[in-house]
């Protein structure tokens, strides 16, 4: 069976995701579509608005298989996020990887990837890296004549292409043009499509504007309890105050003494937003700081990075998805696909189990990695 992977967050699932999944499967002529989905925390440095089990149920409206992107990668910047997703796609023996972009032109991505390979070897690139500038910022400064880097989705798409070239050259990348709404639009202004940001805003404001841009079949899942980043504040504050600077310095993505700034400002902060205002500097992007704070909350350390992919957690599957897994196991019997976490395999998903515990502590929910079996449709 031919398969296409989609790297997703589905935070939450909406019509744009359905369109992407359908188009990806059709254009690549695939038999199976696989969502490699972030768990309970997402790339922007936030808890997902719904837990991973609810979002997996939503996803099965469009795909045949939902697997979990490891938690460490889910709260990482584009390069590591993409690398891990591509390695999982390769582990799942996929033929294609499809991503949404404003460009919609695969040749543009392939050409720019080739140019960046050369740029990264230049002394100027290395000099800017030593200055502490973020990778996206360096590229935007050195590549001024290419609009491809002007949007987050295009930049992430480029990371997928480069990760495929490095770690899984047998996978064919493909891009689908994003429809209508921009990634960070704050308001729902279209009758069929809207950004995840605007949908989350609608939910937080307790309006029902989201109903027009979400498949009717999953409206029931939207009625479930949801959380926001502000809900993490008291737990985050405790996590920071219970450590000293030496301990905080070991947190994943902590650098250049920012742990001291965090300790100096945390007692003044009255909310997550207030803390972000106190911490914001020209040196670091808003998202970088937000991710860093989630790493503190989750207690992810620099040495916790998984060495390789040696198992994949299956969150949900259709009958066709189950058939596909059986096909892979027949060809690669050593590969480990886990549909139920238990005492025997829990050591393979330490970070994910911990992230779920923290998410449940914040949200008051009880669905965890041990008591929630694989979702089947």
From Swiss-Prot:
Primary place of residence? cytoplasm
InterPro entries for the chain: Rossmann-like_a/b/a_fold (IPR014729), tRNA(Met)_cyd_acetate_ligase (IPR008513)
**Enzyme's top EC category:** ligase
**Pfam families in alphabetical order:** HIGH_NTase1
Keyword Nucleotidyltransferase found: no
The subcellular location is:
Cytoplasm
- On the tree of life, the source organism's domain of life is Bacteria
Choose one Gene Ontology CC annotation of this protein and give it. cytoplasm
> Which residues are noted in the entry as ATP-binding?
7-20, 100, 153, 178
User: So what does this thing catalyse?
Assistant: cytidine(34) in elongator tRNA(Met) + acetate + ATP = N(4)-acetylcytidine(34) in elongator tRNA(Met) + AMP + diphosphate
The processes (GO biological process) annotated in the record are: tRNA modification
- Give UniProt keywords alphabetically: ATP-binding, Cytoplasm, Ligase, Nucleotide-binding, RNA-binding, tRNA processing, tRNA-binding
Enzyme Commission number, as recorded:
6.3.4.-
Gene Ontology terms, MF aspect? ATP binding; ligase activity, forming carbon-nitrogen bonds; tRNA binding
Assigned protein family: Belongs to the TmcAL family.
Which function does this protein serve?
Catalyzes the formation of N(4)-acetylcytidine (ac(4)C) at the wobble position of elongator tRNA(Met), using acetate and ATP as substrates. First activates an acetate ion to form acetyladenylate (Ac-AMP) and then transfers the acetyl group to tRNA to form ac(4)C34.
Annotated protein name in UniProt: tRNA(Met) cytidine acetate ligase
Which organism does this record belong to? Staphylococcus saprophyticus subsp. saprophyticus (strain ATCC 15305 / DSM 20229 / NCIMB 8711 / NCTC 7292 / S-41)
What gene does the UniProt entry assign to this protein? tmcAL
């Amino acid at each position: 069976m031919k398969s296409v992977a989609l790297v997703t967050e589905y935070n939450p699932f909406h019509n744009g995701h359905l369109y992407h999944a359908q188009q990806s499967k059709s254009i690549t002529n695939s038999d199976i579509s696989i969502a490699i989905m972030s768990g309970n925390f997402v790339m922007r440095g936030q808890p997902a608005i719904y837990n991973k089990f609810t979002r997996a149920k939503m996803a099965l409206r469009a795909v045949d298989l939902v697997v979990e992107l490891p938690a460490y990668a889910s709260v990482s910047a584009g390069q590591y996020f993409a690398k891990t997703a591509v390695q999982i796609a390769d582990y799942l023996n996929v033929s294609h990887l499809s991503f949404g972009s404003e460009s919609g032109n695969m040749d543009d991505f392939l050409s720019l990837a080739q140019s960046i390979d050369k740029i990264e070897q230049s002394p100027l690139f290395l000099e800017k890296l030593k200055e502490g500038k973020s990778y996206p910022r360096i590229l935007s400064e050195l590549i001024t004549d290419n609009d491809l880097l002007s949007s987050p989705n295009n930049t992430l798409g480029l990371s997928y292409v480069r990760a495929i070239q490095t770690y899984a050259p047998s996978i064919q990348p493909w891009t689908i043009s994003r429809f209508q709404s921009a990634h960070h639009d704050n308001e729902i202004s279209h009758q069929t499509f809207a950004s995840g940001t605007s949908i989350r805003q609608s939910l937080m404001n307790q309006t029902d504007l989201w109903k027009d841009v979400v498949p009717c079949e999953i409206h029931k899942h939207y009625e479930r309890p949801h959380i926001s980043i502000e809900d993490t504040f008291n737990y985050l504050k405790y996590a920071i105050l219970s450590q000293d600077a030496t301990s905080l310095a070991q947190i994943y993505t902590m650098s250049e003494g920012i742990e001291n700034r965090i300790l100096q400002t945390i007692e003044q902060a009255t909310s997550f937003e207030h803390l972000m205002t106190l911490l914001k500097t020209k040196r670091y992007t808003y998202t970088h700081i937000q991710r860093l704070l989630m790493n503190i909350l989750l207690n992810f350390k620099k040495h916790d990075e998984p060495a390789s992919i040696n198992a994949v957690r299956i969150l949900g599957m259709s009958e066709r998805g189950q058939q596909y897994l059986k096909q892979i196991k027949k060809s690669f019997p050593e590969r480990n696909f886990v549909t139920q976490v238990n005492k025997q395999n829990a050591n393979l998903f330490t970070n994910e189990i911990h992230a779920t515990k923290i998410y449940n502590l914040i949200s008051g929910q009880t669905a965890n990695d041990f008591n929630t079996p694989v979702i089947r449709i």
